[in-house]
């Protein structure tokens, strides 16, 4: 069976097709929302418009890589997180498109959330089938979250730590836009950071499993005002994020010793962040950027799981 996944976040319009028999992603496509120069994202009404305009074209593109007539179930992320009160209008575009597609074909529709899609994609990409049935710590680090989650697969999720103010992706994007890059700016910030050879001593404001990142933005602004190079400032920003995550994970492991840590979310696409954490944290799992940043792969996998067509993953 093939399953369809659609995710319409505040960053990108994403679609994916999953083959349950082969246990692999047949194809996926994504288009970032257009953001005007100097702006930090879109209003929800504008995001909803751009998703609605992009979906037919992307569905046509998806059809070039997969037989859409063979799809037996569909999934759509209907809201940001699986918690009461979680709502964002931009997700209406994707779940409505998924509902229309499934109704026209007479196939099941699975409603899930953006965060659960991220978790499923990360666990799948880590190629650890056992993760779906055991406890693990999962970081979801993006422009809208800096959440530390205690999970038993993508279904049972408990948020045990988060940022009390600014999210990691917001700090990164604000620095990138400040330097003249288009939003989202994470890739450019990471590129500049990787070019910096100067040593950096990162700082972190962490209390238990919660953190504060508003001071990071202020420090980056101060560095630029003092004449520090963009490369140094970007490296400082990303390493501070990485050190923050390391300390949050260390606090969580004191309460939940021995659990693996899986990283998901767009910020975790940065090689600078990954290298820092890999050198300092045992039993951690990072996934390729295709599965870390916003995508519909996890949604298509969750659709397969919910209709009883769970793939066989290599351990």
Where are these regions (language model features)?
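A short helix-loop
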Residues: 8-9, 16-18, 23-28, 130-134, ...
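N-terminal phosphate-binding loop and adjacent alpha-helix
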Residues: 33-64
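Short beta-strand-loop/turn "lid" adjacent to the catalytic site in phosphate-handling enzymes
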Residues: 57-96
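Short glycine-aspartate micro-motif
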Residues: 3-6, 70-72, 90, 136-140, ...
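Conserved phosphate-binding catalytic cores of ATP/NTP-utilizing and phosphoryl-transfer enzymes
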Residues: 1, 107, 111-137, 301-305
């Amino acid at each position: 069976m093939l399953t369809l996944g659609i995710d319409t976040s505040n960053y990108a319009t994403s679609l994916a097709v999953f083959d349950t028999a082969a246990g692999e992603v047949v194809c996926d496509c994504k288009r970032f929302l257009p953001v005007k120069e100097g702006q930090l994202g879109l209003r929800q009404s504008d995001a909803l418009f751009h998703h609605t305009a992009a979906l037919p074209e992307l569905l046509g593109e998806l059809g070039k890589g997969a037989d859409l007539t063979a799809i037996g179930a569909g999934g759509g992320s209907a809201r940001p997180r699986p918690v009461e009160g979680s709502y964002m209008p931009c997700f209406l575009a994707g779940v409505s498109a998924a509902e229309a597609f499934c109704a026209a074909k007479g196939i099941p529709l699975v409603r899930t959330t953006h965060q659960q899609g991220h978790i499923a994609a990360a666990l799948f990409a880590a190629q650890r089938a056992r993760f779906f049935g055991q406890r693990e710590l999962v970081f979801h680090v993006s422009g809208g979250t800096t959440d530390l989650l205690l999970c038993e697969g993508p279904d049972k999720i408990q948020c045990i730590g988060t940022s009390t103010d600014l999210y990691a992706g917001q700090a990164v994007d604000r620095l990138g836009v400040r330097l003249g890059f288009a939003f989202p700016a994470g890739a450019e910030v990471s590129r500049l950071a990787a070019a910096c050879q100067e040593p950096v001593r990162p700082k972190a404001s962490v209390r238990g499993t919660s953190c504060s990142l508003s001071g990071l933005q202020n420090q980056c602004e101060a560095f630029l005002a003092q004449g520090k190079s963009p490369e140094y400032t970007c490296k400082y920003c990303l390493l501070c994020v990485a050190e923050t995550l390391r300390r949050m994970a260390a606090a969580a492991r004191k309460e939940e010793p021995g659990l693996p840590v899986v990283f998901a979310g767009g910020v975790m696409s940065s090689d600078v962040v990954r290298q820092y954490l890999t050198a300092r944290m045992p039993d951690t799992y990072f996934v390729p950027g295709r599965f870390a940043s916003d995508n519909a792969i996890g949604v298509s996998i969750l659709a397969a799981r919910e209709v009883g067509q769970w793939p066989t993953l290599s351990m």
